[in-house]
């Protein structure tokens, strides 16, 4: 049995619509090269909550909370060709999307 190569692409952003849009665009590019693809797989959303005092030095009970969520998607490509990798490298992702690629 031959060993299969895998590429895992993890997309992260604070805007869920941006992550979904670019995940679909990556899938469209990979489908053109006849590689097997799994995804986009939604990973758990992480909420970040920060609590700060409203006043600079008094009123400890008066606080304000700020929160934001980071959304993640995973795309797995099985048996990528050199054409697949070249097309993925040519994609220009926006600055709001963080991409992590593992092979």
From Swiss-Prot:
Q: Which SUPFAM superfamilies match?
A: Ribosomal protein S10
**In which family does this protein belong, per the annotation?**
Belongs to the universal ribosomal protein uS10 family.
* Self-association and partners: Part of the 30S ribosomal subunit.
| Molecular functions (GO terms) | structural constituent of ribosome; tRNA binding
Spell out the Gene3D superfamilies in the cross-references.
Answer: Ribosomal protein S10 domain
Q: Give the UniProt record's GO annotations in the biological process aspect.
A: translation
Gene from which this protein is expressed: rpsJ
Q: HAMAP family, from UniProt?
A: Ribosomal_uS10
Q: From the UniProt record, list the coiled-coil ranges.
A: none
| The protein, known as | Small ribosomal subunit protein uS10
Protein role: Involved in the binding of tRNA to the ribosomes.
Keywords carried by this UniProt record: Ribonucleoprotein, Ribosomal protein
- GO CC terms of this entry: ribonucleoprotein complex; ribosome
């Amino acid at each position: 049995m031959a060993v299969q190569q895998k590429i895992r692409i993890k997309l992260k952003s604070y805007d869920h619509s941006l992550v979904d849009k670019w995940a679909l665009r990556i899938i469209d590019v990979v489908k053109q090269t006849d590689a097997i693809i799994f995804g986009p797989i939604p990973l758990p959303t992480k909420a970040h909550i920060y609590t700060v005092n409203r006043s600079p030095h008094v009123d400890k009970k008066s606080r304000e909370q700020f929160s934001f969520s980071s959304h993640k998607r995973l795309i797995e490509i099985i048996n990528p060709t050199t054409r697949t990798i070249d097309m993925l490298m040519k994609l220009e992702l926006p600055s709001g999307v963080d991409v992590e690629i593992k092979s």
